Amino acid sequence: MKKILFIVYFALFFINNSLADTKAEEREFILYAKLPIVPKISILQISTNLLEIDKEKFELKFNIKTLNIVNYISSVNGDGLVLGIIKSNNYYPESYKYEYTRGNKEKSVYIEYSNENIIKEIFTPQFDKNKLTPITNKQKTNTIDPATLFLRLLDINKIYGCNQDIKIYDGKRRYDVIFSDKELTKHGIECSASQNRIGGFKKDKIDPLTKADLVKIRYEDSTNSRFLGFYAKKGLIEIIIEEVH
């Protein structure tokens, strides 16, 4: 009898999981840097693997690694994992973990959330917060991690047509992404944005008003909302993120 019950339970478990509505998507992006007269050069590769389950849960695995000359000057290679929920057609993290090697130093950050509030933070190694501009617990409320931010930026509908500002905290830095304008062009839609630094930046190097001169996020159109690229300019330096197709 016990054996029969076990078989029935196993069969039901298998059927339920087989019928789960899952969506998997792998994508790859390249970050380029460009100076005047000099062709753009790829300096960073971002790989993502997104799994959505029953339109209620999501799992985002990602890898970030430096390329070309940057890999020799200041190499970075890291893997991350975000587990979260999908509500109101948007992504909200429940946990964020990022482990990476910068040069010869291994580092990691772990953030856990509950009801959009941070309930746990673990850093390896620990860093001296006294050298950084302060961040209060209240300023961490309703924040998301940078990987979830990137995931939202890939779909114009996830940023509500460029009409909602986003609060970000990566375990050290706290900043806002503020959308200011949406423009229809012959190539699609361009969203203008800026960064407002709240805290967690080096005291001797931070200017509260410092930001890129120009930030644009580009989408094909509002119908399919396909991400076309990210463009930023600060002084003579241009930063471009494009998807590899």
Task: Label every model-predicted segment.
Residues K107-P146:
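Hydrophobic, well-structured mid-protein blocks that either form specific transmembrane helices
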Residues I4-F14:
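Sec-dependent N-terminal signal peptides
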Residues N16-A20:
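Sec/Tat signal peptide C-region and signal peptidase I cleavage site
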Residues K140, I144-I159:
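A contiguous pocket-lining binding segment that forms or flanks enzyme active sites
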Residues D21-Y113, I156-H245:
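Acidic, serine/threonine-rich low-complexity disordered tracts
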